[in-house]
């Protein structure tokens, strides 16, 4: 980042990690010379659900704090709701958006869960362990927005869904 400051090189960062906020001084210096944006991925509103599904990433509360810190410093911030997991976190989207806006985020996008062959067994096992009573419902909801499949690798189709549930 310091090299980017020296050369006034624009930077866009997309991360799940709140540690990006520790570079607020460098990002602020860069923002004075070039375009800077930081987008933080926050797929769950609450720490408990996030910890169960994504146990090795930072808590949602820490990510929201990072958004607030960067926004308060004048850094343009955004939100990525990724992955959207139908039947699990899709109902949280309005709350996540509202909280991110309170933290100063000015842009947002979302990406539907992708389950390529190597990820599918890991996800389904984690889901079964984390949500034993809901895992069948969640898999059904994913199929609902994926035209009956758990994944689509078609270009232009991989990151979004179809049908009324996805449109909502």
Residue ranges of each PLM-predicted region?
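Glycine- and acidic
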Residues: 52, 78, 82, 155-161
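Auxiliary Fe-S-binding modules of radical SAM enzymes
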Residues: 65, 90-168
